[in-house]
Amino acid sequence: MTDLHTDVERYLRYLSVERQLSPITLLNYQRQLEAIINFASENGLQSWQQCDVTMVRNFAVRSRRKGLGAASLALRLSALRSFFDWLVSQNELKANPAKGVSAPKAPRHLPKNIDVDDMNRLLDIDINDPLAVRDRAMLEVMYGAGLRLSELVGLDIKHLDLESGEVWVMGKGSKERRLPIGRNAVAWIEHWLDLRNLFGSEDDALFLSKLGKRISARNVQKRFAEWGIKQGLNNHVHPHKLRHSFATHMLESSGDLRGVQELLGHANLSTTQIYTHLDFQHLASVYDAAHPRAKRGK
């Protein structure tokens, strides 16, 4: 066994005995560190004292070229940094050569939006069951206002202004937003309110479970997924996909990025731009159509 292996074995014993990590976590550390052992051995290293920041960077590049994803590489480098920190604490190394070496950011995977035709099919649900009426109202509100799931389940009856077709929501950072919800959502909320007392009247929540309590986020996720299957949609339906679809459809129709930002409750415009997968060409076309200085003289 080489010094490279010996030090790793000592570190794993430390994690097991001193840190009392689970067997699964220990196995993950072992796999990550075996990868660097193999790379170090291939490059002629006999001990970890010979490892420098250049070798760690080369190891990261090699891992990426072999198909390791950004998130997995981040975990691998994290394990390596922890190992080298331990070697420093044992006076085996003077400094951590992996410090400052980071993996590229993992790409942000956004949910695909539901197109307008599929959305209409999703909303055209059988309403013979009072719970189906509730679900239809939730779907209409979620898609009609682009709410976050937490905002939907947090709605109370007092947050409604059905006469003006608006709803008050408490977003991230305890920031309130007053949002239009559309006439379809208003109609289905009214329909649900006519049936709501069948499940209870003491709770202030707008949307109740069949037990008469505020509906949970998990229950909403489950019901939306079930309706997606029942209505024959190919893609899994979850609440965030409705919010994403709202943003995409609003932006396609209006081109008003700032307005969509306000509706979504994003603090930064850049978040909205990424969220709605805008590209530069679309932004340029919005600018050319709207900005006075963009209009070319004849």
Curated annotation (Swiss-Prot):
Task: Extract the InterPro entries matched here.
Answer: CB, DNA_brk_join_enz, Integrase-like_cat_sf, Integrase_catalytic, Integrase_recombinase_N, Integrase_SAM-like_N, Recomb_XerC, Tyrosine_recombinase_XerC/XerD
Q: What region holds the Core-binding (CB) domain?
A: 2-88
Q: How is its activity regulated?
A: FtsK may regulate the catalytic switch between XerC and XerD in the heterotetrameric complex during the two steps of the recombination process.
Q: What is a single molecular function from GO for this protein?
A: tyrosine-based site-specific recombinase activity
Q: Specify the domain of life of the species encoding this protein.
A: Bacteria
Q: Name one Pfam family in it.
A: Phage_integrase
Q: What does this protein do?
A: Site-specific tyrosine recombinase, which acts by catalyzing the cutting and rejoining of the recombining DNA molecules. Binds cooperatively to specific DNA consensus sequences that are separated from XerD binding sites by a short central region, forming the heterotetrameric XerC-XerD complex that recombines DNA substrates. The complex is essential to convert dimers of the bacterial chromosome into monomers to permit their segregation at cell division. It also contributes to the segregational stability of plasmids. In the complex XerC specifically exchanges the top DNA strands.
Q: How does it assemble?
A: Forms a cyclic heterotetrameric complex composed of two molecules of XerC and two molecules of XerD, in which XerC interacts with XerD via its C-terminal region, XerD interacts with XerC via its C-terminal region and so on.
Instruction: Write down what this protein is called.
Output: Tyrosine recombinase XerC
Source species, please? Escherichia coli O127:H6 (strain E2348/69 / EPEC)
